[in-house]
Structures are given as structure tokens and as C-alpha cells.
Amino acid sequence: MPQGDHIELHQKRFGRRLDHYEKVRKKTARAAHKRSAIAQKVTGLKAKLYNKKRYSEKAEMKKTIAMHQERTNKKASDDKVKEGAVPAYLLDREGVSRAKVLSNMVKQKRKEKAGKWDVPLPKVRAISEDEMFKVVKSGKRQKKAWKRFVTKVTFVGEGFTRKPPKYERFIRPTGLRFKKAHVTHPELKSTFYLDILSVKKNPQSPTYTQLGVITKGTILEVNVSDLGLVTQTGKVVWGKMAQVTNNPENDGCINAVLLV
């Protein structure tokens, strides 16, 4: 028989360990993993009893959660609605409010913006993954096939460094890496050889955009500082969008039209 609550007495006198609450927190965090491990290992009658116990615990937990959620749940009130009552969202129906005018202005601006970025090639042919990538076999016995060789033109940027070849999933060959493009200004009817700053959007897939793959219809950002274009406030325009209009992998060069 126990001769006294000596543990509780010691805690009252000297307090707990400095890391006690941290240990308790970690123990509770590990509890779920421990339970899972036991449930996976246990077999036979023990498994049946354990599963029955967990089933009842979960049912109890669901009831408790439901009780707590009752406070936040919104229910339809039984009170009768008075005659002539108008809901809050219909209160401003009498006159056109300032908010509505602003909303219409915003919509109009969006329409203008959408029209502003009409592109020369609104639709392009879909490119299959087999056409875009070539499977590269690797490993001692050439049995691994997780590497891909990009067969289209790419842009990798100025400070690009390859990953170690052993771990590189997408191989972008040096011969298909381009840094410049022939960009035609639609209003000036003249072509300029400009630096590519980045690949903004490849219409095929976000993955290709991330890899910097350039296909027909891709939107590029090009350096137009040499053209001397200025904004309405007088600032020099540095980068502008252009859409690729040819198949660079076939032609060996990138032809694009500037989006003015």
C-alpha cells in the first residue's frame, strides 16, 4: 500500500523539471504515431480488443467535437418575419450608389486591360510530352528512366548553374539555349535583335514556363532599353512582352512580335 503522496509533495515543495511541459508536449505529439504503430503491429484477439477500444474513443471524440461546434453553427430562427422587412443586401436598391458606379468603372478598366493584351497568336497547337522530352536512360545497367532531355529551345538566364549531372532531372542542351530574339515592332514595322530577360508564360504548361522552354506562342520579356521607348511620365521602358511567332527548334532562331 502507498505510504503517502510523496511525489505530489515533492512537486509542491520544489516544483517541476524545467523541461517538463516541453516533454509532455512532445509525448502527446508522439502519441498518435505510437498508437498507429501499435495498431499496425498488433494481431489476433489483442487487435480486436484494441480496435474496439479505439472505435469507442473516436465515437466519443466526434460527439465532443459536435457539441463544441453547436455554438458556432448558424440555424434558421423560428421568429416570424415582419411585413415590409427588406434584407440588408437590398437596402440600397432605391438609388444608384457610389459603390455601384465604382464597380462598373473597375469592370470597364478590366475590359480595356484585356483588350490591351490581345496577342498575335491567340491559339497554338498542343505539344505532347513525348514530343517535348526524350527519355534518357541512366544507372549502371541503363535501367533507370527518370531523366528527361528537353528537345525544344530553352532560356536559362544569366547566372544559371547546372545541378550535378547525376541528379539533374531535366537536361537542357547547350545547343538549344538561346539568349537573344528577333523582335518585330508592329507599328514601326522594323525588327530588332534583343536580349531575352525571362520566359513569362508558355501556353503549353506551367512546368515548361518554369523550365524556360520556348515554343510557338510563348510570351517572352525582352530588353527594349536600346529602342528608346519611354512611358507617359518620361521613364525609360526596360522590359516589354513579346510573343514568339515561329518554331525556334526548326528555324534555329527566335522570331517574336512586340506586344504594344
UniProtKB/Swiss-Prot annotation:
GO terms for cellular component: nucleolus; preribosome, large subunit precursor. The keyword ATP-binding does not apply. Its main location: nucleus. It is found in: Nucleus, Nucleolus. A motif (Nuclear localization signal) lies at residues 11-18. One of its GO terms (biological process) is maturation of 5.8S rRNA. CDD domains: NSA2. It holds the Pfam family Ribosomal_S8e. InterPro entries: NSA2_fam, Ribosomal_Se8/biogenesis_NSA2. Involved in the biogenesis of the 60S ribosomal subunit. May play a part in the quality control of pre-60S particles. PANTHER family: RIBOSOME BIOGENESIS PROTEIN NSA2 HOMOLOG. Belongs to the eukaryotic ribosomal protein eS8 family. Ribosome biogenesis protein NSA2 subfamily. This is Ribosome biogenesis protein NSA2 homolog. It comes from Dictyostelium discoideum (Social amoeba). The gene is nsa2.
